[in-house]
Swiss-Prot record:
Residues 21-71 are annotated as: Disordered. The keyword Nucleus applies. It comes from Arabidopsis thaliana. Interacts with CDKA-1. Interacts with CYCD2-1, CYCD3-2 and CYCD4-1. Interacts with CDKB1-1. Interacts with CPR5. One of its GO terms (biological process) is negative regulation of cell cycle. The gene is SIM. This is Cyclin-dependent protein kinase inhibitor SIM. GO terms for molecular function: cyclin-dependent protein serine/threonine kinase inhibitor activity.
Length: 127
């Protein structure tokens, strides 16, 4: 049955094939583009096996700071002539000793209250 359908199809008429002649005047010596094969154009085997080094950032020109003198964001005062210190050494010692004494007194007070809280907590848990 399928063969009947194939026989009913019309025959297609194509135009005759165009014949293109091959170029017989072609020179293989250099008339076209070719890859150079001489040893001058080949990559040396040492370069082919090892990758090139990674690119590096160019270094800035040498400055006095890079020669050993490091610059800081904040410049240190070389002389105290800009500011006069009008604080006595005894005042400074009294200030720090008073702060130290206050912290010691407050730490012992908190230690006693913590101990009292623990005692009261333990007595409640025993009942």
């Amino acid at each position: 049955m399928d063969l009947d359908l194939i026989q009913d199809l019309p025959i297609l008429n194509f135009p005759p094939a165009i014949k293109i002649r091959a170029n017989t005047n072609r020179d293989d010596d250099g008339g076209g583009c070719t890859t150079p094969t001489s040893s001058d154009h080949k990559i040396p085997p040492t370069t082919a096996t090892t990758p090139p080094p990674p690119p590096q950032k160019p270094r800035p020109p040498s400055t006095p700071s890079s020669l050993g003198i490091r610059s800081c964001k904040r410049k240190l005062m070389t002389s105290l002539s800009k500011y006069e210190i009008i604080v006595n050494k005894d005042e400074i010692e009294r200030f720090f000793s008073s702060v130290y004494n206050q912290t010691m007194a407050s730490s012992t007070t908190t230690a006693i209250t913590v101990a009292k809280r623990r005692r009261s907590f333990r007595s409640c848990s025993r009942r």
